[in-house]
Amino acid sequence: MSNRPFTAKFPRYPENGDEVFIRGKLKDDAKSFSVNFCLPRPAQVAEHQTPPYIALHFKTIYDERDDTSRVVLNWKNLQWQQEEVLDNYWHVDRSQTFRVVFRLHEDCIKVFVNSVDHPPDYQFPVQLPLDQIESIELWDDVEHVEEISFRYDNGNC
């Protein structure tokens, strides 16, 4: 069973252009790491279970056999949908602190490594309502979370 070491609720529902910044450290022997952008969890779904509605599932999987890794992008509407598997070039050295920014748009979520002053490293279409995302969950082999910041686009205020 996966381990969910951290959950953070959005201070308000996100809007187009808002960002989530995460800085943390994986275990040196991490096998996987996931970030889920979750819609409200129905009362009958236990906290240790994966939520039924996930706008973005961003997972990095490390293969110990050949020292390769990959990124899996997916979403969930009761059932997991078709996943997209890409090369991992955002966080290869698990001994180093990671910094990742998720920029939320009505039609996609863009993923940036370290900062947003370059084209997105990954991008995934949003199939569930952006303004219903209420939390993010970090799963699997996280050693510690140093920071999660919610950055709101002032044009939306």
Regions found by a protein language model. Name each.
Residues M1-W75:
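Secretory/extracellular carbohydrate-interaction modules
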Residues D29-K31, P42-V45, D107-V111, H118-D121, ...:
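Eukaryotic short linear interaction motifs
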Residues M1-S2, K9-G17, G24-A30, L128-C157:
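Ligand-recognition surfaces built from glycine- and aromatic
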Residues V116-I133:
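Short, solvent-exposed beta-strand-to-loop segments that form ligand-recognition rims
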Residues I22, R94, F98-D121:
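Carbohydrate-binding surfaces in secreted/extracellular proteins
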Residues P14, Y89-V92, V101-R103, K110, ...:
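Short amphipathic alpha-helical molecular recognition features
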Residues I22, V35, F58, F102, ...:
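Hydrophobic beta-strand residues in large extracellular and virion-surface proteins
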Residues L78-R99:
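Short, aromatic/His-centered strand-loop micro-motif at the edge of beta-sheets
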